[in-house]
């Protein structure tokens, strides 16, 4: 019964977001400010699914300059958890097929996010070049999921290097963001416990280039894997209380 009520609430939310969200975005199509606005709205839905969401974001996170953000990508719950960590003037980079997702896909495009064709390597590489150009010509930051796909309970997957090529090309630091594991969240469970999203310190890209981009990716992954393990242990203890 709980699952049915939540699905109903989600359906209502999706329709409202699509109708009013698209209408709002059409006033200034593909404006980066929309990503921050709707990230907050989606994050508030975590309460509907019985999650106690805790954001750990530095005080200066909302006034920092440009960065390339990298986050772990677990499952569909990311939409209601890690999306809350999006800061102003940040757009995400997602797969092109997202635009065909009913309701969400059209809103995703209108809010100014970047779509890439991951099935076509040459097009994907070209898009990374476009991301670098966009970073150099604007004050917008980008958010990417370096795993390239949802991990679905398999832990932190190996990282692709696209995000790190973009960071090096634009001469920007990388900021990792980690969300504790949400594989145990169930639609039919009233209390789904704590979920922690934490923003880590920036990683400088100075001294890196195409020849050692893998080293940068590995450094970020090691930090994120350690933080994920730490957060998961903390969540276990919090859920016992």
Summary of predicted features, one role per range:
Residues 28, 53-55, 186:
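Aromatic-capped interface at the extracytoplasmic side
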Residues 58-63, 189-191:
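A short beta-turn/loop motif at secondary-structure boundaries
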Residues 125-241:
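Non-catalytic C-terminal accessory region of glycerolipid acyltransferases
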Residues 55, 69, 92, 197-199:
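Generic preference for hydrophobic
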């Amino acid at each position: 019964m709980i699952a049915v009520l939540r699905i109903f609430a989600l359906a209502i939310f999706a329709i409202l977001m699509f109708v009013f969200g698209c209408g709002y975005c059409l006033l200034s199509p593909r404006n980066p400010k929309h990503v921050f606005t709707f990230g907050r709205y989606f994050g508030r839905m975590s309460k509907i699914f019985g999650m106690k969401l805790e954001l750990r974001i530095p005080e200066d996170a909302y006034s920092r300059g440009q960065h390339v953000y990298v986050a772990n990508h677990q499952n569909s719950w990311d939409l209601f958890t890690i999306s809350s960590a999006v800061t102003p003037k940040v757009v995400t980079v997602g797969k092109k097929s997202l635009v065909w997702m009913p309701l969400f896909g059209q809103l995703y495009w209108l809010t100014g996010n970047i779509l890439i064709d991951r099935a076509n390597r040459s097009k994907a590489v070209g898009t990374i070049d476009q991301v670098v150009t966009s970073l150099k010509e604007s004050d917008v930051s980008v958010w990417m999921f370096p795993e390239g796909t949802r991990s679905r309970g398999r832990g932190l997957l190996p990282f692709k290097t696209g995000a790190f090529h973009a960071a090096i090309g634009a001469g920007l630091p990388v900021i990792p963001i980690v969300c504790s594991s949400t594989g145990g969240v169930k639609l039919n469970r009233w209390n789904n416990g704590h979920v922690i999203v934490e923003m880590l310190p920036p990683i400088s890209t100075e001294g890196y280039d195409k020849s050692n981009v893998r080293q940068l990716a590995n450094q970020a992954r090691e930090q994120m894997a350690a933080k994920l393990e730490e957060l998961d242990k903390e969540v276990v203890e919090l859920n016992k209380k």
